[in-house]
From Swiss-Prot:
InterPro entries linked: CYP450_sterol_14alpha_dmase, Cyt_P450, Cyt_P450_CS, Cyt_P450_E_grp-IV, Cyt_P450_sf
Gene3D superfamilies from the UniProt entry: Cytochrome P450
A GO CC term attached to the entry: membrane
Compartments, as annotated in UniProt: Membrane
Species this protein is from: Penicillium oxalicum (strain 114-2 / CGMCC 5302) (Penicillium decumbens)
Names of required cofactors: heme
Domain of life: Eukaryota
UniProt: heme binding residues: 429
EC number: 1.-.-.-
Family matches, as Pfam families: p450
Name the UniProt record assigns to this protein: Cytochrome P450 monooxygenase poxD
Molecular functions per Gene Ontology: heme binding; iron ion binding; oxidoreductase activity, acting on paired donors, with incorporation or reduction of molecular oxygen; steroid hydroxylase activity
Family classification: Belongs to the cytochrome P450 family.
Bilayer topology annotation: Single-pass membrane protein
Amino acid sequence: MVSPVVLATTAMIVVFLLAQRYLSLPVLPNEPLLIPHWMPFFGHAFRFARSKRSFFRWANAKTGGQPFSVPMGGRRHYIFSDPADIAGIHKNGKTLSIRGFVRFIYISIWGFKPADADAMWEIKPEWHRMDIEWLLSDKNDQIAVQYLRRIEEQLRALDAEVEGAPDKAIVRPGLKTVVDVQGKATCQVLYGATTLEKHPGLLDDLTIMVRDGFWGLLFRAPRFLFRNAYEARDRIINTYADLVENIETRKDVSQYLYERTVYLTQQGISPQAQGADMLRTMFASLLNSMPTGYLALLHILAEPGLADEVRKELIDCGYLERSPEEMLEILPGKMPLLRSIWHETLRMHNNSLTVREVTADTKFMGKTKWQVQKGGVINIPCGLMHFNEALHPDPESFHARRFMDKELGGEGESHARTTKPFGGGSTHCPGRVFAEKQMIGLVAALLMRYDMGIVNADWKMPLVSEFDDITKQPTVWIRISKRV
């Protein structure tokens, strides 16, 4: 007689095989190569969740660097990384849409109600125009000048800490130092110093929300499982809702946010929904630039002599003689080494993912002709492009001068076509220009003001700049003293 265990196991295998057969889409001509998985519905989801960077690089190696597709979460995910293919995807925005992904993120991460997320999407053309006007045009200089002034204020507070130490030197966590200086300066510029005074734990709440609950929020896990993250998000949203309700009396808020708030209020967007939207803009303005600034600083301190070379570049372009208003005459245009370090740090550590939903069977021309099926999801992981040896020789190593012109002593690579840390197409991040000024402004100010060195000999460079990951890495301690 056959054992019940054997029968049950056999039945389970049969069910799995039937589900695999009938739930899987056929592979069409000109469709990226499918990497199958024995598990129905979930597919490669668990491997992806452990480390999307490792997963994409494993699959990419398995297919010889060609586009591929994987079953994951009940859908077929198409992965592209060649610049020509990416350009073809961005040209087909009607059937390769970001709408569903944006709605999902608005509700899951930022805490929008579904109706509010839909209302924001309907009026996106106008508020996105404001974003572009203030963040991509010359108007962003107004924000950048105020940011540089606020950086100076934060560094004066750090000066006092250094001067009060017995040997005129302090040892601080590197990431926390960047968050304190850059994070506070950015929040004061955009949302007003009053907002930070009323909620001094704003940046700590952002850290708690992302570090302790990003994935729980993303997949809408029960609140009791990620209570700290949910409560931190609530406090941030309520803080910004209070700002919206009192916008006419908050004279220190940026003109950019003021105009945006007035428009959204006129369109009937509630203070609570606008609070969620300000959380979104806070997230966007800090959670790429802060980790990148931190990692750029670590690379500079880790490479012998590089800090002094950066300081020489700054002195040569007249950094010491300039006020914040005058600084933008040289920042970042006259700082090719720092700009190259910025782009190289983004190349090595940015782990962002551009996502498009396939809303109709679509054929598009990239490096070759491709076909993708309705219901699928296109993923563009920038890391695959960033570590493509054909685009970036010796991709596993940090090259400070990789993106400097050859006539300046650099390697002459162009970041514009071969790196995608800020997405592309219609959703190309409008804050990318200000983000560069944020990072370079911060790192330049720190290096010119302080002697800095990494204290712990066993430290390791974090692999990725995602804030939820980098906050969980072992602390890198930095010794800080005033330069003579």
